[in-house]
Every structure is written in structure tokens, then in C-alpha cells.
Amino acid sequence: MVVAKKSLGQHFLTDESFLDRIVNALPPLNPLKLIEIGVGLGDLTLKLLDRYPLKTYEIDSNLCEKMRARLKAQKKPFQLELVEKDALFLKEEEPYFLISNLPYYIATRLVLNALKDPKCRGLLVMTQKEVALKFCTKDSQNALSVLVHTIGNATLLFDVPPSAFSPPPKVFSSVFEVIKEPLKEKALASLLQAPFFEEALQKGFETLEDFLKACFSSPRKTLSNNLKKSVSYREKLDKVLDFLALENQPTSVRASEIKDYLKLLEYLLKG
């Protein structure tokens, strides 16, 4: 019997109906490689292997051992590359699509890593519902929604109740999808000079991420007050005010009321 480790935020999805819904929600992958974070009890992994070659990252050596045993018991060939490694250090040389039931405590960081990685072309993940809603909201209510919609489109697909897991978490989970869009990536990459497109895209994402942290540092305060506290951007405050005037927005505007952050950042960097 496998005992979930609280230190790794393990809650294993066991409900067959939700496992099937996740697999069926995958978009067409060819020619993308499919990457999974976390094998868990192997239930989702085996369903994926029935349809696709798969590479999966798992930090828990006990779960890796259990997964290898389950594969042997299946007595049929699977195309699985099982990597016993922390997914925070995931690095692929080929374009891929990411799928995972992410641990709550590290879900946001792993999603941001995938968004930042030019090789990742999209993701289908399950997180705490609150986190999923932050990524999928269509406006500029928070930094996460701005980041994801600057590089692609995020769609909330369905909720998963605590009863679908073992052990059950205290909150609902949600499955959401992100598909990156080349035209949006091109606009983000154009922010900074770099010899290669992927390098420019990654630097553009990191620059926008840093800027949004400053803008949303205190969401209830005005954008100007937040940037005054930022070592990196306080000297650009006059240019921010100029931009607001050009956009017919008041100086009292909050971060959540900015319509186009990429346009604002481009103005600050190049204007």
C-alpha cells in the first residue's frame, strides 16, 4: 500500500471518470512529445500510455518503483521514459505538451516554468481551484492571468471534488488548459534584443513577470504607488504616467485596470 507523503503534497486521483475526462481533454499532440509530471499511483500514466509514448518526471523513488512494477504486471509493451528527478529541473530539447495533477504547494511555480519554457507548447494540468481561476480569468485581475494570456490562451475545463482523490484534499481542484500562440509569443519576444528567438522569448517573459510583481505588489493600491516602492521601476514612474495619459486612464488607476501590460512595458523599455 502506498502512503501519500504530506511533504510532497500528494493526493492521488483515483476516480476513473475524472481520469478518463483528463485523457480525453488532451488536444491533438502530433508532433509534440507528451511529458507528465508525477506518476502518482500510475492510474493516469497507464491511461496515457494506452494512447501515447510518454516521458514522466517523478521525484518520489517509492512511486517510481511501484510504477515499474505495475508496468511489468501489464505484460504488454509501453513507450515510457521514467525520469526520477525533481520536475523543477525539467528541461527538454524538443517541443512538448505537459500534463499533470500538480501538487498544490508547488503548482504555480511549475505552471510558470512551463509558460516560460519555449519548448513547452501547451499544458493540461490540475491544480487547486483557486489557483486555476487565477490563471484562467480573462481580464487583468492578477499577475498570473496577465502572464498566461500574454503568451497564449487559458481555459478552465472542469472541477474535481475532494472525493475523487486518495487521500481527499480539503478543497476542490480544477483542470485547465493553456495553449500557446505563436503571434503572442512573437510580440513578447520583441520586447528585448537577443540573438535567438527562444532566448528573446524567455527574457521577455521574465521581464514581464518581474514587472507584474511590482505592479500587483499591493493590489488594492494604485499602480503608481506600487511602482514607487519598486527599485527597478520607480525611476520610470513619469513614463508610466505619460502612458496612462496617452491611454486616457487616470493616474489613480489600479493594476487590475490596465488594459494592455505588454504595450505599457514596451513603452517603458523603448518609448
From Swiss-Prot:
SMART domains registered for this protein in UniProt: rADc (SM00650)
Positions with a binding annotation for S-adenosyl-L-methionine: 11, 13, 38, 58, 86, 101
GO CC terms in record: cytosol
SUPFAM superfamilies per UniProt: S-adenosyl-L-methionine-dependent methyltransferases (SSF53335)
Annotated GO MF terms: 16S rRNA (adenine(1518)-N(6)/adenine(1519)-N(6))-dimethyltransferase activity; RNA binding
EC numbers: 2.1.1.182
Main location: cytoplasm
Keywords: Cytoplasm, Methyltransferase, RNA-binding, rRNA processing, S-adenosyl-L-methionine, Transferase
Catalytic function, reaction form: adenosine(1518)/adenosine(1519) in 16S rRNA + 4 S-adenosyl-L-methionine = N(6)-dimethyladenosine(1518)/N(6)-dimethyladenosine(1519) in 16S rRNA + 4 S-adenosyl-L-homocysteine + 4 H(+)
Protein origin, superkingdom: Bacteria
Subcellular location(s) per record: Cytoplasm
NCBIfam families associated with the record: ksgA
Family, per entry: Belongs to the class I-like SAM-binding methyltransferase superfamily. rRNA adenine N(6)-methyltransferase family. RsmA subfamily.
Protein name as annotated: Ribosomal RNA small subunit methyltransferase A
Lineage: Bacteria, Pseudomonadati, Campylobacterota, Epsilonproteobacteria, Campylobacterales
Gene transcribed to yield this protein: rsmA
